[in-house]
Amino acid sequence: MGCAVSTARDKEAIERSKNIDRALRAEGERAASEVKLLLLGAGESGKSTIVKQMKIIHDTGYSQEECEEYRRVVFSNTVQSLMVIIRAMGRLKIEFADPSRTDIARQFFTHASAADEGILLPEIVLLMKKLWADGGVQQSFARSREYQLNDSAGYYLNSLDRIAQPNYIPTQQDVLRTRVKTTGIIETHFSCKQLHFKLFDVGGQRSERKKWIHCFEGVTAIIFCVALSGYDLVLAEDEEMNRMIESLKLFDSICNSKWFVETSIILFLNKKDLFEEKIKRSPLTICFPEYTGTNTFEEAANYIRMKFENLNKRKDQKEIYTHLTCATDTNNVKFVFDAVTDVIIKNNLKQIGLF
């Protein structure tokens, strides 16, 4: 009798042990398939646009209702951009090509200030179209590197006829180009190639950086965004500091940090489309006086790439995976993120000895 009881207890113990093993294995597999990505970079480097692309590429995208919610942001971005361009004319000593536009500008500011932000009234649109067509305004816009202007300004102002329609609903591209400063930490979840991603987007402005520490533990990889087009611009929060130099300093501190000794670093040299246009008229020596190469896209972009990759002090241990990106181009981001996912899978297999 005692032998039978003992055998039953042994079976129960063995079954309990198997259940624990199964639970541990399942937890291990779940942990192995969970990827934490920290999205870092200086302000206005395109991080939030990358997050929006993940929703478009790996989720259901933006529903019609969600797009409608962005209408106010599109209107606000468009109106504010034109205000900034016209205000800059005074500082740049640029006159309106048509003197009558001075009064139109005054009317525009009066109407825009009185109107509810995020509403585009027909009378404001009419004034905006006249101002945007003015040669002086276009001259000020062409010199936007000399002041702070959203990258999306030209895109929205050139689309005034479309976005002013009464039944206007922002497109996915319109949503991608909206600009709202990120404060705090935005967490986004999505799946790709059997991996479950948690993407953390943190505020890029200097005042936000002290909050990053909460995301550090257990991060699989860092995506560091740099605006290639920022080489001839200064920071919004410090007009003495060149944006590219600030990005280099920040990358140096992240790449060589004790927190990230084992962490893969993926470098997105972003806004390649803006850089390709800008490098034709604005030399790289503005940022790097020692540069002796040509002001062509390939040579200038490679030089910037080298400047970042050379900051890596652990080349024997840590590889920097660099990609040229255009965050507003969904196909480009999809292609690049596929490559990023493959790197993460390879590194995961290495860690468990299968690669």
From Swiss-Prot:
Chain positions recorded as Mg(2+) binding sites: S48, T182
Which residues does the annotated region (G1 motif) include? Answer: 36-49
Q: Which PROSITE patterns match?
A: G_ALPHA
- Give a GO cellular-component term: cytoplasm
Q: State where GTP binds.
A: 41-48, 176-182, 201-205, 270-273, 327
Where does the record place the region G5 motif?
325-330
A GO BP term, please?
A: regulation of protein localization
According to its UniProt record, where is this protein located? Cell membrane; Apical cell membrane
UniProt keyword annotation of Cytoplasm present: no
Instruction: Give the record's keywords alphabetically.
Output: Cell membrane, Differentiation, GTP-binding, Lipoprotein, Magnesium, Membrane, Metal-binding, Myristate, Nucleotide-binding, Palmitate, Transducer
Q: Where is this region: G3 motif?
A: 197-206
Region described as G2 motif: 174-182
Sequence segments annotated as region (G4 motif): 266-273
List, alphabetically, the SUPFAM superfamilies matched.
P-loop containing nucleoside triphosphate hydrolases, Transducin (alpha subunit), insertion domain
Q: Which Pfam families match?
A: G-alpha
Looking up SMART domains in the UniProt record yields: G_alpha
Locate the lipid attachment (S-palmitoyl cysteine).
C3
Q: Which family does it belong to?
A: Belongs to the G-alpha family. G(i/o/t/z) subfamily.
Tell me, in a sentence or two, what this protein's role is. Answer: Guanine nucleotide-binding proteins (G proteins) are involved as modulators or transducers in various transmembrane signaling systems. Plays a role in glial cell differentiation during embryogenesis; loco, Galphao and the G-protein coupled receptor, moody, are required in the surface glia to achieve effective insulation of the nerve cord.
Q: What is this protein called?
A: G protein alpha i subunit
Species the sequence originates in: Drosophila melanogaster
